[in-house]
Amino acid sequence: MKIAVETTLFDFFVIDQFKKSTFSAPNTKVDTIKGCINKFIEQFNVYDEQHIFWQPPGKSNVRLLSNANDFGQLGNFLHKKIKCNIFIGEEALRKYDLNICGPYDKFVENSDPSVKKVVNRDDVMLSRKCLNIISEQLSILEKSISKAQNQVLQSSEVEGKKCIILPEDKPELIKFFSKFETSVQLQEVYEGYKVYEKLLQKFGGQKKRMESFLNENTPMSGAEAIKQINISEELKEKGERLTTPNDPLLHVEVSNEDNSLHFILYNKTNIIIPGNCTFEFSSQISEVFSIKMGPHEIGIKGQKELWFFPSLPTPLSNYTMKVVNQDGETILVGKCADSNEITLKSPLASFSTGSFQTGSFHTLQDPTNVFRADALSSPDESSIMSTPFLGETDEVYNSGSTLSRPFTWEEI
């Protein structure tokens, strides 16, 4: 059964390893799916055991769903309407000496003997009550979908005029649009939006750069503003041309939304970047804290995505960032100013031959594309792996390379 909600649709499956029970429910609201997953995590105590498997359709590499970053990747697949399976397999968990359900008697005690039937094959047991719990959680999801469907099916016309139904969980939208009573007022908003779009295009779609430009400059005419933007772009391009190819730079942009740090390290070189590095942050107004990159190397044209919740008492500002290798050597260092952008350079002669060339950290804070992970658990370093660049996923999956694609469990 497929239920259309807000013009888009995708399927969500939960399957046990023997495929005795399969449940599916369509939905488009990322928040609803995240809520269902959160309830699933709470029920299975995954915050302690942190082991669920998932994989895109047609791909052989099963992924470990264990931290906020992995939930974000799963959310992207679902948001793009790609069918995706979540596998809960005791056979696989036992093979890798992992655990998801905890002691089996936790799911069978204090229940009717007839309920204590389990799937038994090759000495592997999965409690049927465990599957029933999954079914209950998906029932909650279906009820939420039905409620959303009823809202969508409400009449979208009032006295022959078209209208827009605003979601009840977005009070800021309701407050904003309730101020407009005439088409003239909406036309003015539309004209302002076209100006905003044109200005945003001048900054290459980078909202932070545009906001920084508007905040740091006094009001000026449209012609002067465009002129200043062009000058700024020319200076930036000139500075980029003056940078030598062998200058090992990493450009960092850190966001403090949700009190989290979320960035990606790209390896655009022709060598492998070693693992077990540590990122150290320090400033005059906050304590020094460090983030471990994890044991996995970053392969050629690979990337490492990190998402952390350091619970900082104050936002990061005017801080120094160091990248320290496992021998305790600082291989990259730089200082962030008010612009919240930082250039890291290597103080070591061994890295002056262009081994890092150029790379960048990017924040991913778009709530329409990534799960907001403020309610999820802290990362498990063992699950941070080397993954391919965006746009190269299918090519890398189908290639034989082990440096720039997700690792299989056998390779780990």
UniProtKB/Swiss-Prot annotation:
Location of this chain's protein in the cell: Preautophagosomal structure membrane
Any GO CC annotation of this UniProt entry: phagophore assembly site membrane
Pfam families, A to Z: ATG19
Kinase found in the keyword field: no
Membrane topology: Peripheral membrane protein
GO biological process assignments: macroautophagy; protein targeting to vacuole involved in autophagy; protein-containing complex assembly; protein-containing complex localization
General function of this protein: Cargo-receptor protein involved in the cytoplasm to vacuole transport (Cvt) and in autophagy. Recognizes cargo proteins, such as AMS1 and delivers them to the pre-autophagosomal structure for eventual engulfment by the autophagosome and targeting to the vacuole.
Record-given protein name: Autophagy-related protein 34
Native source species: Saccharomyces cerevisiae (strain ATCC 204508 / S288c) (Baker's yeast)
